[in-house]
Amino acid sequence: MEKLIEPILVDELELELELEINSTPLKYKEITKDIKNILLIDDSVAQSDILFNSVNSNTLGIEYSNHSDRDELITLLTDNFQTIDRIGFVFNDGMINSKQFMNSELFFTKEDLEDGMTEYSPNVKFVLDIIKNFKITNIDYLVCNGLKESNWVRYFNLLNKETGVIVGASDNETGNLRYGGDWIMETTNEDVVNIYWNSNISNYTTITCDNKYHK
């Protein structure tokens, strides 16, 4: 009788291929003594190059992707700043409730928003630590219609509750008025365009909404 050859069992874990995602380096310009604001710009937002190149002399524009590394950003900030007045985030509203920030991880998880949480996911902890460590007074989310998303409102409230930071966010389209948006943070009724940008921002011909995306 022909002898059956038994299959060799291999631990499935040994067969798993680990996916290496190459970190996308942060893009930024010379850091001067006049800088007191940070503007983080997602490189997938429409016309991100104009947003990046139009920052004013008080603002350090940093272009990132969701594959960028938190450690690189915290090292950059720690090596160059003791305090930061305010920080802004510019990204589009595509897949807004599963929006990734750095290290290919979400801005926040559903668990972060549960009552009584004291331990948070990596990017929530990261933002909270930056606010506390650099004594940031204002944080602005320059994305379309953030205030219309209940989970984002809860996230904004979490940041305020944990740190006392003033959160700027919008309930309409964000961008230049002539193209259907504005730069007003409805939570504070503050127009932030001149806080972060110089007059070259007038060349931004779209809004930070995914359905208007074009480069």
Predicted segments with their positions:
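Caspase-like cysteine protease fold
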Residues: 169-213
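Solvent-exposed loop and beta-edge segments used for protein-protein assembly and interaction
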Residues: 31-33, 81-83, 133-135
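Short, flexible loop/turn elements at secondary-structure junctions
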Residues: 43, 143-145, 189
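Catalytic cores of nucleophile-dependent amide-cleaving enzymes
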Residues: 85-86, 92-178
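Short, intrinsically disordered N-terminal pre-domain segments
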Residues: 1-10
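A domain-level signal for caspase-like cysteine endopeptidase catalytic cores
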Residues: 13, 17, 21-76, 155
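Short, solvent-exposed mixed-charge patches
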Residues: 1-2, 213-215
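Small-residue-enriched, tightly packed secondary-structure blocks
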Residues: 38-41, 45, 51, 60-70, ...
